[in-house]
C-alpha cells in the first residue's frame, strides 16, 4: 500500500511518498520485504584483489562477515560494517620468517658510469685522428669549405642533403649519414 502525504517544514510544503508494506502471507501477491544483505558489486582493483585471494581465505572472510552481521541488531537504518582487520595472507605481507613474499628483485649490479675512462678514450681517439698519419680521405674543414665553394663536392660529402626520405626537405645531416660517410672514407 502506498500513501502520499504533504508536510510543512518551516513554511515550505513538500510532498513525500511513503511506501508501507504489509506483512504478506503465503496467499498474498504483493511484494515481500527482503532483509537479506546484498553483496556490493566489486569493480576495478577490488575485483582483482578478490580474485587473487585463495578460496579458503575467501570462505574465512565470508564466515567473519556473517558473524559480524549476526551480532548486529536487525534495525534496517543501521549500516552493516565489515571488520577492517587485514587478511592474514595477502601479497606483500611478511611471512613467518620476516621476509616479504613480494620482493622486487634487484637488477644486476652495473658498473657506474666512469667519466674519466670515457674522457680518456675520446681524447685518445681524437689524438689518433689529428696527430696520426693523415690518410688521403681525411679532409680539414677548410678543404671542405673550399670544395663546397668551388662546386667540386661529391654527394658523399654534401652535408646539406639527407638521404632519408623522411627528412628529405630538411637541410641537416643525420648522424647515421655522417657515420656512413666517415666509415666509407
Swiss-Prot record:
Keywords: Cytoplasm, Nucleus. The keyword Cytoplasm applies. Interacts with IGO1, LSM12 and PBP1. Residues 1-116, 147-168 are annotated as: Disordered. This is Protein PBP4. GO terms for cellular component: cytoplasm; cytoplasmic stress granule; nucleus; peroxisome. The lineage of its organism: Eukaryota, Fungi, Dikarya, Ascomycota, Saccharomycotina. Residues 1-24, 46-62 have a biased composition (Low complexity). Residues 73-83, 91-102, 147-166 have a biased composition (Polar residues). The keyword Signal does not apply. It is found in: Cytoplasm; Nucleus. The gene is PBP4. Present with 1560 molecules/cell in log phase SD medium. It comes from the Eukaryota. It comes from Saccharomyces cerevisiae (strain ATCC 204508 / S288c). Its main location: cytoplasm.
Amino acid at each position: 500500500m502506498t500513501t502520499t502525504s504533504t508536510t510543512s517544514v518551516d513554511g515550505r510544503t513538500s510532498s513525500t511518498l511513503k511506501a508501507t508494506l504489509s506483512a504478506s502471507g503465503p496467499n498474498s501477491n504483493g511484494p515481500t520485504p527482503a532483509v537479506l544483505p546484498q553483496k556490493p558489486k566489486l569493480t576495478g582493483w577490488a575485483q582483482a584483489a578478490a580474485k587473487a585471494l585463495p578460496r579458503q581465505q575467501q570462505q574465512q572472510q565470508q564466515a567473519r562477515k556473517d558473524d559480524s552481521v549476526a551480532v548486529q541488531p536487525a534495525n534496517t537504518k543501521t549500516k552493516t560494517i565489515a571488520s577492517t582487520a587485514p587478511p592474514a595472507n595477502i601479497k606483500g605481507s611478511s611471512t613467518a620468517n620476516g621476509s616479504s613474499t613480494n620482493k622486487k628483485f634487484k637488477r644486476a649490479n652495473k658498473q657506474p658510469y666512469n667519466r674519466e675512462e670515457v674522457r680518456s678514450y675520446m681524447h685518445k681517439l681524437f689524438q689518433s685522428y689529428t696527430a696520426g698519419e693523415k690518410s688521403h680521405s681525411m679532409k680539414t674543414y677548410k678543404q671542405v669549405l673550399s670544395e663546397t665553394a668551388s662546386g667540386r663536392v661529391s654527394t658523399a660529402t654534401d652535408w646539406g642533403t639527407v638521404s632519408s626520405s623522411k627528412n628529405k626537405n630538411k637541410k641537416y645531416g643525420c648522424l647515421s649519414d655522417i657515420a656512413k660517410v666517415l666509415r666509407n672514407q
